[in-house]
Amino acid sequence: MQRKTAVIVGGGPAGLTAAYELLKRSDIQPLVIEQSSQVGGISRTERYRGNHIDIGGHRFFSKSDRVMNWWLDIMPMEQTTEQAFAIQYQGQSRSVEQAGEGPDPETTDRVMLIRPRKSRIYWRRRLFDYPLSLSADTIRKMGLIRLGRAGLSYLRAAACPVTPERNLQDFIINRFGRELYNTFFKSYTEKVWGVPCNEIPADWGAQRIKGLSILKALKHALMKQRSGDVSQKNTETSLIERFLYPKFGPGQMWETVAGEIQERGGEVLLRHTATGIATANGAVRAVTVRNEDTGRETTIPADYVFSSMPVRELVRILDTDAPGSVRDVANGLMYRDFFTVGLLVEKMKLEDPQTGDRIRDNWIYIQEPDVLIGRLQIFNNWSPYLVADPSKTWLGLEYFCYESDAIWSRPDPELIELGTRELGKIGIIDPRDALDGCVIRVKKTYPAYFGSYTRFNEVRDYLDRFENLFCVGRNGQHRYNNQDHSMLTAMIAVDNILAGITSKKAIWEVNTEEEYHEAK
């Protein structure tokens, strides 16, 4: 009997997970099609002169045991003699032996590091805890008058919440009060999306900061537990204090998975783009693929198709005439684009007050309205192995825009100069300490919850009619998934195929629970 084939469009976490699961659990042959020159999608690692760039920052944690096990099967956790770092699940200790006898990152590359989490907000040229806490430091920096206003504003919101919550502004004010919304949320969020918060549906808050509020942040501050449980099931995501991280960044995980797929007999084609999908009788029959190096097109028969490509593009390349309303909704879906300025500096002006060394933050939310930069990563603090020279500081300056914006097309040297100037303006570096830089542009990084999104179910229902087409991943579902959610959509799609389940409902239900997300 001829072996069945699955064509997988997209070599990010969802696509590679689907391919690996098919090879591990079935005799279905996967073929991964990736448009770019490397795997990983937005979870890839870029490299520049020996330094590594994690695009957007990817902490490896999940409330899913299945995902945590999957990661550690691919890349074991580093050795540690400290019991506190043992991973635990639902009160049961797991992989204690691995945690105690894992590989040494000094001698082994295929290893997960255990890293401390620290994120803060930069506002009025000062650093504040994120999530906010009523520490002496916060009180001193905010001042009693502003703090009092924030407290009264929160009490007012708690007593008279906005109902119904029509937009993101309402969502945040109901949980933090208007004063803290204006102080710590408004500027950054509007940089990310390029539109006012009152024009963004509340769905975005439900996906990215759900479960968090002033009361939970205070409870966490007062009852801090350092149990060492990296999966931390009962901790709201933005309060998690430890995470796992591949030695050379998230791309190392997905490059390793791609290698495993090829060793098991699967194929991964880089610089190949899906340009057409043939359908018949309610199913996908073939995918046409273009080799970006030669321009040659090939049509590949498919028994199953997994798509993590943007939904807008998927509807466009289907050979069937979708109803006009479906095409209109698909064409109206919007995406926010993104670029990172990698900046190597001699040192930062911000120092740890206790040690005088480099601050320990993984990333910093820039809430300053007088600069365009939205977020700053300090790659040394993600993994010391991301930096060629540990005596220098390797930064990632994150900017959000549309591909049509003028800033997107500015030459790299101008963007490097912009980033250097802005960090100097807000007191994070001395521009004279800048040594080198690069620019990484990423299209369609963030599927937007505005545009035609409120009618997205019309597109979803149409695509679900194709019995062997599975929409997975962030852009594949037009949902603001983290990488573990993207993986779960692929895992469940494979589950359905192997179990003969035709309903796609469980795939779409991933990441709809009201308890999980890192605020980004």
Q: Where are the regions a protein language model picked out?
A:
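Glycine-rich FAD pyrophosphate-binding loop
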Residues: 23-48
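Mid-domain catalytic core of redox enzymes
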Residues: 25, 246, 270-427, 455, ...
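Dinucleotide-binding Rossmann-like beta1-alpha1 core, especially the glycine-rich loop
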Residues: 49-158
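Short loop/edge segments at beta-strand edges and connector loops
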Residues: 115, 270-272, 473
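Active-site/ligand-binding neighborhood in enzyme catalytic cores
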Residues: 135-138, 143-280, 285, 293, ...
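C-terminal lid/capping helical subdomain adjacent to the catalytic/cofactor pocket in oxidative enzymes
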Residues: 440, 450-520
